[in-house]
């Protein structure tokens, strides 16, 4: 029972990430728009009073605020998309269902505009009226105030309708409404029933939520923040933290803004107070992340590096630097946390307790900083320093330094005292399977027991989430050998921690299971015998030339942590100046990705090179690329492989920087030439 529930909660937690992922963009617009007419900033920069600047700042602020004002709708659509595998029909059904559900509740309970705005008749303008907290005006519909819970409920129901009826067949005369077209229709019926049910069920639930909110926030908020911090971090390994913090961020607490509108939830209240220019009272459930994410965990990473064996320090140092910097800048801590969670749980226990105290200390000091993504330096600048006079954000720095010291010495002591096997202190090297980029999803699928053993497949920012039919068929050791930093098992639910490449692995696995991608050709053990003698060329030195005209940069400067952190192998970055990618050596085309954004080559001496054209170009679905070669085709150095529309890539991709990665460097030495300007005849690397 628990294991099945855990699997369902996993899916819901993943689904909630989609609407939450929209908030950073909205938060940036709101923060910058508000900052541009901040009184202190205007005094320093009087040019901000310019009418055009004022208009721009007002537009930015309004554009950001409208997202926070309509979070329930976004949660309805996002939850449906997440639980229905990303199908747009489910999103449309959720949108229709959400509107119908609210309209139904309004009609059943006879809710009017006057019921929503208690003092509307006496106010000069409707926007100045005080809003009645039990009711809401949702996209112009007077209805019950169900908040994000209402959106999540309708999104989940729309996804259920999609999964149940997307392939339904109807009689020929109703054939037009069969299949996916039937989903919004049946969702509408479900929405009416849900609206009627909630009309009577939601008011007592609403009273209960308000009572719980008042108890948590008014009885002992200091203790509540401490417990919140502990539980939120404790749920990270299970991927259920999104479910836990959502009520605190989006429902608990209330504030009436200057427009007379009731705003609920710690994060939403903070954003409303940012816009209103009033002292912050919200932020108790966000501020505590900044000290341990920006200072504590990077210090823990240094302690892990310091205790690594001398021969492992270089490798561990690179991993810890990358993970620590990611935590500091963005607040994405999973790559670092999972590096010690499975091998040294005692360290994670220490981390959880310190995270709880961080929330407590920030609350006691009166520091109130909002966030939209996570507690990294970027959010600290936007929501802390830009409003330092109201947020008291400067206190984060001395507190963070103290946490860095505490984290470092506690981790250092625990590692040495208990002889913990943190990265770099393992008894022996774990065998890592040589799985090229093209083969990795195939190998992971095999390790999971094959496609017949996959019941549900999903992924989030850092982990591959799989529900399997038979857990005994899963090769956990094999998954770790393929590069997973850990594997969490709860019943038949598996979470493999592959870091930022998890989503791409999931994407490729889904295509493999549907037959869209076939396995790269391999030499089998039982090859057809030939009368001709087989010539086996000895492995030797391989010269690798530039793949076109452009600039060569160090791999560390590639704007992607997976490549820059050498998670896929070593190499260089190439910035193309002409729209043609050529072969860097004589060899064979082993892989052309379906989206044409990456090519896998093998030299005559067996060196495998991946040319990944641009960053995040997989999302372009092949637009801007024209392949000039085929898989298994022999190519010569300088032969054109791909035509690239650089103008299109610059407009639609984060970067045109093209990583060139050697994916099988085991027992080989890579020599990188000191080259900046490149052309197809210039040597840039040698593998010995």
UniProtKB/Swiss-Prot annotation:
Q: Which GO terms describe its biological process?
A: D-glucose transmembrane transport; phosphoenolpyruvate-dependent sugar phosphotransferase system
Q: Does the keyword Cytoplasm apply?
A: no
Record GO terms (molecular function): D-glucose transmembrane transporter activity; kinase activity; protein-N(PI)-phosphohistidine-sugar phosphotransferase activity; protein-phosphocysteine-sugar phosphotransferase activity
Q: In what residue span(s) does the PTS EIIA type-1 domain sit?
A: 560-664
Recorded E.C. number(s)? 2.7.1.-
Intracellular or extracellular location(s): Cell membrane
Domain PTS EIIB type-1 as annotated: residue spans: 438-519
| Residue ranges of domain PTS EIIC type-1 in the record | 3-427
Per the Swiss-Prot or TrEMBL record, the active site comprises 460, 612
Bilayer topology reads:
Multi-pass membrane protein
Listed A to Z, the keywords are:
Cell membrane, Kinase, Membrane, Phosphotransferase system, Sugar transport, Transferase, Transmembrane, Transmembrane helix, Transport
Record-level GO cellular component terms: plasma membrane
Q: What is its main location?
A: membrane
- Purpose of the protein: The phosphoenolpyruvate-dependent sugar phosphotransferase system (sugar PTS), a major carbohydrate active -transport system, catalyzes the phosphorylation of incoming sugar substrates concomitantly with their translocation across the cell membrane. This system is involved in alpha- and beta-glucoside transport.
| This protein's domain notes | The EIIC domain forms the PTS system translocation channel and contains the specific substrate-binding site. The EIIB domain is phosphorylated by phospho-EIIA on a cysteinyl or histidyl residue, depending on the transported sugar. Then, it transfers the phosphoryl group to the sugar substrate concomitantly with the sugar uptake processed by the EIIC domain.
What's the protein called, per UniProt? PTS system glucoside-specific EIICBA component
Taxonomic classification, please? Bacteria, Bacillati, Bacillota, Bacilli, Bacillales
């Amino acid at each position: 029972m628990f294991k099945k529930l855990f699997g369902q909660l996993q899916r819901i937690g993943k689904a909630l990430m989609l609407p939450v992922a929209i908030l950073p963009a909205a938060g940036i617009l709101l923060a910058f728009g508000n900052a541009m007419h901040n009184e202190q900033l205007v005094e320093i920069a009087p040019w901000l009073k310019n009418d055009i600047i004022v208009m721009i700042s007002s537009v930015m602020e309004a554009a950001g605020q409208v997202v926070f004002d309509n979070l329930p709708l976004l949660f309805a659509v996002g939850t449906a998309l997440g639980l229905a595998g990303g199908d747009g029909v489910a999103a449309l059904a959720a949108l229709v269902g959400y509107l119908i559900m609210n309209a139904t509740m309004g009609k059943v309970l006879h809710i009017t505009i006057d019921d929503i705005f208690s003092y509307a008749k006496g106010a000069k303008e409707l926007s100045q009226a005080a809003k009645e907290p039990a009711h809401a005006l949702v996209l112009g519909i007077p209805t019950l105030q169900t908040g994000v819970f209402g959106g999540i409920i309708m999104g989940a129901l729309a996804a259920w309708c999609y999964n149940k009826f997307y392939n339904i067949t109807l009689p020929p005369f109703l054939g037009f409404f069969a299949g996916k077209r039937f989903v919004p229709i049946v969702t509408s019926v479900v929405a009416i029933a849900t609206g009627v049910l909630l009309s009577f069920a939601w008011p007592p639930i609403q009273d209960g939520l308000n009572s719980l909110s008042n108890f948590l926030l008014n009885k002992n908020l200091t203790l509540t923040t401490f417990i919140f911090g502990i539980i939120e971090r404790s749920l990270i390994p299970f991927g259920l933290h999104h479910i836990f913090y959502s009520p605190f961020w989006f429902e608990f607490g209330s504030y009436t803004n200057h427009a007379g509108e009731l705003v609920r939830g710690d994060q939403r209240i903070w954003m409303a107070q940012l816009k209103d220019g009033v002292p912050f009272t919200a932020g108790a459930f966000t501020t505590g992340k900044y000290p341990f994410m920006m200072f504590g965990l990077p210090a823990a990473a240094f302690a892990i590096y310091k205790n690594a064996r001398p021969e492992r320090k270089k490798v561990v140092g690179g991993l810890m630097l990358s993970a620590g910097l990611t935590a500091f800048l963005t607040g994405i801590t999973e790559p670092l946390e999972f590096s010690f969670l499975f091998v040294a749980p005692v360290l994670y226990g220490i981390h959880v307790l310190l995270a709880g105290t961080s929330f407590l200390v920030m609350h006691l000091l009166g520091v109130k900083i909002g966030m939209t993504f996570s507690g990294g330096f970027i959010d600290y600048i936007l929501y802390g320093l830009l409003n330092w006079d109201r947020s008291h954000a400067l206190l984060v720095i001395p507190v963070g330094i103290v946490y860095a010291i505490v984290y470092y010495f506690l981790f250092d002591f625990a590692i040495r005292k208990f002889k913990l096997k943190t990265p770099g202190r393992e008894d022996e090297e774990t065998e890592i399977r040589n799985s090229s980029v093209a083969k990795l999803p195939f190998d992971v699928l095999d390790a999971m027991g094959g496609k017949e053993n996959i019941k549900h497949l999903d992924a989030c920012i850092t982990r591959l989430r799989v529900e399997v039919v038979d857990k005994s068929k899963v090769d956990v050791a094999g998954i770790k050998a393929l590069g997973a930093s850990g594997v969490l098992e709860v019943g038949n639910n598996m979470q493999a921690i592959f870091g930022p490449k998890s989503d791409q692995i999931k994407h490729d696995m889904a295509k493999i299971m549907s037959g869209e991608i076939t396995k790269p050709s391999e030499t089998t053990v039982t090859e057809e015998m030939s009368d001709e003698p087989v010539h086996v060329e000895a492995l030797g030195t391989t010269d690798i030339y530039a793949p076109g005209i452009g600039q060569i940069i160090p791999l560390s400067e590639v704007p992607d942590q997976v490549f820059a952190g050498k998670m896929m192998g070593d190499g260089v970055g190439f910035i193309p100046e002409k729209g043609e990618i050529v072969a860097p050596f004589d060899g064979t085309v082993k892989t052309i990705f379906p989206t044409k954004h990456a090519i896998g080559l093998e030299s005559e001496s067996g060196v495998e090179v991946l040319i990944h054209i641009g960053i995040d170009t997989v999302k372009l679905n092949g637009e801007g690329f024209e392949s000039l070669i085929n898989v298994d085709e022999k190519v010569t150095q300088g032969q054109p492989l791909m035509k690239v529309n650089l103008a299109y890539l610059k407009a639609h991709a984060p970067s045109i920087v093209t990583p060139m990665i050697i994916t099988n460097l085991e027992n080989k030495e890579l020599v990188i030439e000191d080259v900046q300007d490149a052309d197809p005849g210039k040597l840039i690397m040698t593998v010995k």
